[in-house]
Structure formats: structure tokens, C-alpha cells
Regions:
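Acidic/aromatic/glycine-rich contiguous surface patches that form carbohydrate-binding/processing clefts
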Residues: 215
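Extended intrinsically disordered or low-complexity regions, especially N/C-terminal cytosolic tails and loops
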Residues: 1-207, 219-313
Length: 313
């Protein structure tokens, strides 16, 4: 077991980065300020690796501290951009799921707390039990004035109100155990998606939403689960290993594919425009990482911009 690292001042940290890491410091005052604002571990621990020479601990000659900061800021801008549209998808799912559930079962609180109103198979049993417990807790929360108002005024909270306090993860689990008829009604709003593709999209997007919300490193993140194959995977000629696509399944490009199906066309074009702008900016500012390297780390094919050329079916 190694000896724990000792405290070091911001000035000492800058010296360590320069002398021990061999990273160029163009402005010590700027470097100290960035370490003060961000912290050594989130910055260096999270973003230095792309500047290393493969299979060594050495850095590419000429790598500067400013480049590492630029990569960090790029990731922060990515989180903000992706989070905006993840929230948009989340809002629409709240609306559609509560609408179709209430249309089928009615607005009474007891309906969404009834396990019989879900696809109550042996496989889904544990998920449904946990979901109903979550929904019950949400009905008793005092953190939201509108929940308090409905409880005091009407004695219960309809699902279209309660849905606003549920997390993306709650919504994903709820969709997973919806009856097939309800899954179908929701999914038809995103044709040509089928129920399975929709379910996998929600599962993966939940993970990415959490990464964005908690300020974790986004651009290299991968989920354990994967989105289902779509016609876009084939049309984009994404690389395959055997029958499995190597990109656009568990990586950030999987989220882009999901957005292509889930966002209105004009919103996706705006998202794509902003994404191109951020990638172009970091490519100008970061000399020692090529665009191909960066895109590969993100799980993007080099031809990713052509995603809007193809029909979704």
C-alpha cells in the first residue's frame, strides 16, 4: 500500500505539474487560479490522460496546462448542452406517461398505487414493489408547495402532478413495468421507435442525466447497458465487432442517436449546431489531441454530422 499523499499548496501543485509531469505552464498565476477554482484532482485526475503517450506515464511534448483546462471546460459545456435536452426529453416523458396512464385508469391516486395496473409479471414484481413505495413517499413529501396544495385541497395527488417530483430514473422504471398497451401509446409519439427501443433509450439516458447533474466527466463516459440497435446504426455504417456495433450503443454518441429520435427536428438541429460549435472550439484550443482522437473517446464516428441526412425508419 502506497503512502497517502500529503497536503501541498496551490503553488506547490503548479510546480509539481511542471517539474514532475513535464507539462508546460505558460502562466503560473493563471494555473494557481484554475487549481483554486477547480481543484487538482477533478482537473488533472479527470482530464490529463488524453495527453499521455500510449502505454506510458509521459505526456506528449509541449502539452500545456491551458490545454488541460480547455478540455475540462469543453466537458463542462458538453454537460450543460446535453443536460438541457435530457431535461426536455424528461419533461415530455412526464407529460405522456401521466396522460396515458390517467386516460386508461383514471385520475385517482389509488390507481397508480395499484400493482395490478402494471405489467405484474414475476420478473417485474420487485421493480413494481419498489416503484409503488417510491410513489407513496412522493405523495407525502412536504418539499413542494403544489404537492401540499393538492393533498390539502383534494386529499390526493393525481399522477400528472406527482410526475413532476419523480426522477428520470423513476420514470424509466415506471415505463419498464407499464402494460404493453401503455408502452405502445407512449412510443407512438416517437415513431418509428418500438417499445423495446424506447425502454433502452430511457435506461441509458437516465445514467447520462445523472452524470450531467452531478458534474462527472461526460465525454468519455460509458454505460453498462446499451441502447437497442436502430436503423441509424446501419445507415451511419458504424463499426462492428461481429454482430455488435462498437459505437453509438453505450457511449455519448448513443445519446445523440436517442436525441435524433426523441427530439423534434428543429430542436435536434439546434442541438447539433451547438455541439459542432463546442467540438470546433476545443479543437482550436487543444493542440495535442487530434479531432479524430477526441471523437473516438466520445464514441463518435468521424462521419457523425451526417446523422441528419438519413430518415429514421
Amino acid at each position: 500500500m502506497q503512502t497517502p499523499k500529503k497536503f501541498s499548496s496551490f503553488s506547490d501543485q503548479v510546480s509539481w505539474i511542471s517539474d514532475e509531469k513535464g507539462i508546460k505552464i505558460n502562466d503560473r498565476e493563471y494555473a494557481e487560479e484554475m487549481l483554486r477554482q477547480i481543484g487538482y484532482f477533478p482537473l488533472m485526475g479527470g482530464y490529463k490522460h488524453l495527453f499521455r503517450i500510449s502505454n506510458t506515464k509521459k505526456y506528449k511534448a509541449g502539452t500545456s496546462f491551458e490545454e488541460i483546462v480547455s478540455l475540462y471546460k469543453f466537458d463542462a459545456e458538453l454537460r450543460e448542452l446535453f443536460f438541457k435536452y435530457l431535461l426536455q426529453v424528461e419533461r415530455q416523458m412526464r407529460s405522456l406517461m401521466s396522460y396515458y396512464f390517467t386516460e386508461m385508469y383514471g385520475a385517482e391516486q389509488k390507481q397508480y398505487l395499484d400493482a395490478n395496473n402494471y405489467n405484474h409479471t414475476k420478473r417485474n414484481h420487485a421493480t413494481i414493489v419498489k416503484l409503488i413505495a417510491t410513489l407513496k413517499r412522493a405523495t407525502t413529501t412536504t418539499d413542494y408547495t403544489y404537492i401540499n396544495y393538492y393533498r390539502k385541497t383534494y386529499g390526493e395527488i393525481p399522477l400528472w402532478v406527482l410526475a413532476n417530483v419523480l426522477t428520470f430514473g423513476n420514470l424509466s422504471k415506471m415505463f419498464r413495468v407499464f402494460p404493453q398497451s401503455l408502452k405502445s401509446k407512449v412510443s407512438k409519439n416517437f415513431e418509428p421507435l418500438n417499445q423495446h427501443q424506447m425502454e433502452q433509450f430511457l435506461s441509458v439516458l437516465t445514467k447520462y442525466r445523472n452524470v450531467c447533474a452531478h458534474g462527472e466527466r461526460l465525454f468519455t463516459y460509458r454505460t453498462v447497458d446499451a441502447i437497442a440497435d436502430t436503423p441509424l446504426h446501419k445507415k451511419l455504417s458504424l463499426p462492428q465487432s461481429g454482430n455488435q456495433y462498437e459505437k453509438g450503443k453505450q457511449d455519448l454518441f448513443a445519446v445523440v442517436i436517442a436525441f435524433r429520435y426523441l427530439l423534434p427536428g428543429k430542436d435536434f438541429l439546434e442541438f447539433k449546431r451547438k455541439l459542432i460549435k463546442e467540438i470546433d472550439r476545443v479543437n482550436r484550443e487543444v493542440e495535442h489531441i487530434s479531432e479524430v482522437e477526441l471523437l473516438n473517446k466520445m464514441g463518435f464516428p468521424e462521419t457523425w454530422k451526417s446523422i441528419t441526412k438519413y430518415h429514421l425508419k
